Amino acid sequence: MTVQPFSPDSDLTLDEAMDELVSAEDFLEFFGVPFDQTVVHVNRLHIMQRYHDYLTKAGDLDEHDDQARYAVVPAAARAYLDFVESDALTEKVFKVFRMHEPQKTFVSIDQLLS
């Protein structure tokens, strides 16, 4: 897929501009972030979740606001670079990586019989 690069000066909203993006590679190309295909292949879900996390931490970004339009590019680059410099196990983007031990639930016989 050929991706049109992101332009903060576009008349489209961010949602409209990103409507056709379907992969992590599309997002990185859209935001002009150079990437190593191997890193993206192994970490695509982690990169996209981290990007989402960074946008969430940035607060309520009005997609028509010029500042918001400039804030999304560094978030995409930072999300990708997190996994160039580290790995999924270290970054712990998803809850399953943050769990130290298996979750155990004890149900007594009395609870079962009541």
Curated annotation (Swiss-Prot):
The parts of the chain that form a coiled coil are none
Task: For this entry, list what GO says about its biological process.
Answer: nitrogen fixation
Pfam family for this entry, one? NifW
Q: Would the keyword Nuclease be found if you checked this record's keyword annotation?
A: no
Key words, A-Z? Nitrogen fixation
InterPro entries in the record: NifW
Answer yes or no on keyword ATP-binding.
Answer: no
Stored HAMAP family: NifW
Family membership noted in the UniProt record: Belongs to the NifW family.
Q: What does this protein do?
A: May protect the nitrogenase Fe-Mo protein from oxidative damage.
Query: Could you describe the subunit structure of this protein?
Result: Homotrimer; associates with NifD.
Q: What is this protein called?
A: Nitrogenase-stabilizing/protective protein NifW
Q: What is the lineage of its organism?
A: Bacteria, Pseudomonadati, Pseudomonadota, Gammaproteobacteria, Pseudomonadales
Gene behind this chain? nifW
